[in-house]
Amino acid sequence: MAQKAPGVITCKAAVVWELGGPVVLEEIRVDPPKASEVRIKMLCASLCHTDVLCTKGFPIPLFPRIPGHEGVGVIESVGKDAKGLKPGDIVMPLYLGECGQCLNCKTGKTNLCHVYPPSFSGLMNDGTSRMSIARTGESIYHFASCSTWTEYAVADCNYVLKINPKISYPHASFLSCGFTTGFGATWRETQVSKGSSVAVFGIGTVGLGVIKGAQLQGASKIIGVDVNQYKAAKGKVFGMTDFINPKDHPDKSVSELVKELTHGLGVDHCFECTGVPSLLNEALEASKIGIGTVVPIGAGGEASVAINSLILFSGRTLKFTAFGGVRTQSDLPVIIDKCLNKEIQLDELLTHEIHLDNIQEAFEILKKPDCVKILIKF
């Protein structure tokens, strides 16, 4: 049980002490929220592949730090300037915000707000941390403006979304990054149209989000590509029409296999969800000449990727994305509503559950072929 001291909460959190080190449970102190901040009691969290990269120093090697950027919680306390939020509200901590007033927000064309962009400094807006090791007082870096693998977290209110409390908390956690990123890429970033063709490289949580988004947008052919045969069944549940396991065709490239299913033309939209650098060129080659669009979504931890410019000269478009282009205040509630009315069903995402006390086990579970999403309980 977390113990409260005046103004400070002592609780448990998962901490990474060094580059490539294990995630260990520590007792930490969580300061009260400052002016525009809220302190959140986490109800559940989940594991995203980016959290694995976090332990390896992505995007900046800051240690010690608390990983986790997916989760849902209830506000415990608020700063004096945290408008629109109050104790008891169910919220998602997020890694980007939406002011609604900056040039980017007013265009309606992007979710990358000038005022509340993604931040990976590991610190709050005033340049300090709200978390420290209880036994030593050493400051702990935040991750992606949130750090959700802790019983209590502090976030700026502009990076928090108050959500409908009727939604399943595990589902809300899955929507706070992975699934929404894939879904949004088809809806907000590329506007997949009715009758179009789509290829999805990597059928994890992000890839399944792409598949469901493409289905709801009316795509007629949705090709899933994965070396894990288990993902074929998962993809079908979310709307995939065709499945390719490259291991079954060692003499052919992925792009060749995709073209075989599209009369030699390739697809209108290809979404690269693995983060494997070499697959980006394959994704480009798998898209149609002149009109094909490729969206890299997977985070692979590579600082740079070599792209065959000759493929781009053939009129294909390469479009990068953050959070699938989904605006946190304007669009994310729409996706939540789709879940509440069963237009989107996320039960099939949840394959494993662990308690925060056993957080290191999650990294081994993630390697299992039947693992899609791991729920972290507190």
From Swiss-Prot:
Q: Which GO terms describe its cellular component?
A: cytosol; nucleus
Q: Where in the cell is it found?
A: Nucleus; Cytoplasm, Cytosol
Q: Where does NAD(+) bind?
A: 49-53, 202-207, 226, 231, 274-276, 297-299, 321-323
Q: In which tissues is it expressed?
A: Present in non-glandular trichome cells.
* Major location category of this protein: nucleus
Per UniProt, what is one GO molecular function of this protein?
A: zinc ion binding
Where would one find the signal peptide in this protein? none
Q: Where does Zn(2+) 1 bind?
A: 48, 69, 177
Provide the cofactor note recorded for this chain's UniProt entry.
Binds 2 Zn(2+) ions per subunit.
- The record lists Zn(2+) 2 as bound by 99, 102, 105, 113
Describe its assembly. Answer: Homodimer.
The UniProt family comment states:
Belongs to the zinc-containing alcohol dehydrogenase family. Class-IV subfamily.
Protein name, as recorded: Alcohol dehydrogenase 1
- Give the species this sequence originates from: Artemisia annua
Gene from which the chain derives: ADH1
